[in-house]
Amino acid sequence: MKTTIEAILTTMVGGRPVTRDASARAIEKLKINSKAYIFCVAMPSFVCGCACECLENILKNKNLKISYGNKVYSVANYCLVYPPLPPAKLIVPRTEKKLNKIAHDIIERKKREIPRVNFIVKKKIDKTMSKYKPVLKYADLGFKITDDCIGCGTCDRVCPANNIEIIKNKPVFKNKCEQCMACVSYCPQKAIEYKLDENELKEKGIDTKKVKIIKIMKLTKKSKRYHNPYITSSELAKKKKIYNSYDKQ
């Protein structure tokens, strides 16, 4: 199967392993010209992770090198913990301006080193995530579907982890959630709420005292949600089909 590497990279993110892994599997199977001009752009919120470095390692195994790398800070949308930050009306204009410059760099085939995660930041991220990782397996236990759900199936179509199945017109989660927030951000009815039950996690063997973040993980209908206004649910669904097609090979 042939596609363009640009199509895959548009959805590669560093902090959400499912999208990274799905992209990785697809890229590993791509046939790429050894002379290709390969670019990557990370779009972090507060801290730039290791998305570009992950891609670099994948391509290195294919004897390929990234020609151009850059980063653009955007809106953090992990709405289970905090509202969209910085406010879109403040950050998006700056983001668009920088993206326009990056687009011109790419058109001109400029060379630029990829952004790399700071050692101190990486150590902090690794320490934090190591505590949260055991919870990730049960993270979707916190999702609650309200009566506002109309059974449209948008959540299923945009979930890159194939974690949602529509049964009797209601979404059912299958314990493979990677917390990308696509389902809650694109739900037209805001019918997906969230609150983890600590007692339920304890029954699963999770020491909730070590994972303090779960105490503040909460989402209600009134909670603010955010997704890129230029990316539709249909486009995400299309990307998901690309990932799935590679997994079937």
Region spans (language model):
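Iron-sulfur cluster-binding cysteine motifs and their immediate structural context
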Residues: 144-145, 154-172, 178, 182-200, ...
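A short, structure-level motif marking secondary-structure boundaries and short turns
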Residues: 39-41, 140-141, 168
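FMN-binding flavodoxin-like domain, especially the glycine-rich phosphate-binding loop
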Residues: 1-132, 202, 208-210, 214-249
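Charged, low-complexity surface patches
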Residues: 47-48, 148, 176
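A mid-sequence, solvent-exposed acidic-amphipathic segment
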Residues: 123-160
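Functionally constrained cores in energy, signaling, and assembly domains
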Residues: 10, 33, 70-71, 142-144, ...
